[in-house]
Amino acid sequence: MKTPLKHYTEFLNENIYKNIKYLNSAEDYLGRFYGEFMSYSGGDGQSLGIVLTPKHITELFCELVELKSTDSVLDPCCGTAGFLIAAMHDMLQKTDNFEEQRKIKKNQLHGLELQPYMFTISTTNMILRGDGKSNLEQEDFLKYNPSLLQEKGCTMGMMNPPYSMGSRNNTSLY
């Protein structure tokens, strides 16, 4: 007899993890889940500046900047990693070379995220796609050392910066 935890774990593995891991998609499933979860929690996250970028917008960014498989991408406010997922998907589609694909995942995607819970989601998102969160950092972009950013050698930047519509009484949000 299966325990509830065992049943739930098997369900997640069969119906979610396997679909995300092997699906060739730029969809930010964890971001969508987070957004849906926030809608049931009594808030939408917007008061904290949390507005997730839709997939069609992240894909449009990749098209507009004419992303190449050799580019290195930085999202300084990566949230759930939607832009990095779209960039990775786009760049992987542009090469059949296994070594280049490995390099894209390991070296060419960089993200910074200040919020710990969003950093956890972005890290999980990238691990599920075989990236291993190699270049994600829980850091404040505005306080990040510019010379360290230059060392990353990024050729493209993509971002949807957080903004707040909350109370001006909470100056930490501005």
Positions of predicted regions on the chain:
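Long, N-terminal intrinsically disordered regulatory "head" regions
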Residues: 169-174
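Conserved S-adenosyl-L-methionine
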Residues: 47-156, 164-168
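Long recognition/docking surfaces used for binding and targeting
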Residues: 1-41
